[in-house]
A protein has these predicted regions:
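Short, strongly hydrophobic alpha-helical membrane anchors
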Residues: 1-4, 214
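Juxtamembrane transmembrane-helix termini in multi-pass membrane transport proteins
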Residues: 3-73, 138-162, 169, 173
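Kinked, hydrophobic transmembrane alpha-helices enriched for aromatic residues
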Residues: 11, 127-141, 203-206
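Short, conserved phosphate/pyrophosphate- and ester-handling motifs at nucleotide-, phospho-/glycolipid
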Residues: 21, 129, 197
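Juxtamembrane helix-boundary/capping and inter-helix hinge elements in multi-pass membrane proteins
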Residues: 31-38, 113, 181-184
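Membrane helix-loop-helix hairpins that form the core translocation module of multi-pass transporters
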Residues: 37-118, 175
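Selective transmembrane alpha-helices of multi-pass membrane proteins
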Residues: 67-100, 165-176, 180-214
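Selected transmembrane alpha-helices and immediately adjacent juxtamembrane segments
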Residues: 115, 122, 126-131
Length: 214
């Protein structure tokens, strides 16, 4: 693979990744609610989730989802409903949080209760995005040179995309977490939970409205 093609791929991916989708909205909402403690599990989940989506795309599931409206809809609804479930949990936590909660209560939110749950929730949101899986099937071949080893090129492109996605998620997580720390009062944290739940709800609706590429 030539450097020109690789740089073109990096540029195209960077433009697309900067635009927030369901995964990044999830990262922002959790970072706002949980601060710096969420950064590592969130970024790791994005990297592993994108790796999973890339793997299943290359193994043929992406082609199946592109060809079958039924299976695309099944995966789409699974991901969208899961996002709405997470949104409901975060909104409920925000509504139940008293305005005069102690700082310790705010610093250690109970929903989700652990870094593992932050990781698992974000991973599922990323991996269960059928539009992303189909996107990889349509997008990666545009940067493949027929005369060169196909598998090697796919590995390079996949590793590049996952790296860029992790960097992008890190940037969003750091900025969102910083906003949460700057406004660390109980009332502000309650608002962050409500805002985060709203973002997750928007991401869920976005996922449910996704259409199968023609």
């Amino acid at each position: 693979m030539s450097l020109e093609i690789w740089f073109a791929f990096v540029a195209a991916c960077s433009v697309m990744l900067v635009i927030p989708g369901p995964t990044i909205l999830t990262v922002i909402s959790y970072s706002m609610a949980h601060g710096r403690r969420a950064n590592v599990p969130l970024v790791a989940a994005v990297a592993l989730g994108d790796s999973t989506a890339l793997a299943v795309s290359l193994l043929g599931l992406g082609s199946l989802l592109a060809a079958s409206a039924f299976w695309f809809t099944v995966v789409k609804w699974a991901g969208g409903l899961y996002l709405l479930y997470l949104a409901a949990k975060m909104l409920r936590a925000g509504l139940r949080a008293p305005g005069n909660a102690s700082a310790s209560d705010v610093a250690a939110p109970k929903v989700p209760a652990s870094r593992w749950r932050l990781f698992a929730n974000t991973y599922l949101v990323t991996a269960l995005n059928p539009k992303g899986i189909v996107f990889f099937v349509a997008f990666l071949p545009q940067f493949i040179r027929p005369g060169a080893p196909i598998a090697q090129q796919l590995w390079i492109l996949a590793a590049t995309f996952v790296t860029l996605a992790a960097i992008n998620a890190t940037a969003y997580a750091v900025f969102a977490g910083a906003a949460g720390r700057l406004l660390a009062s109980p009332r502000a944290q309650r608002r962050f939970h409500l805002a985060g739940g709203s973002l997750l709800g928007a991401a869920g609706i976005w996922a449910l409205m996704a259409r199968r590429p023609a």
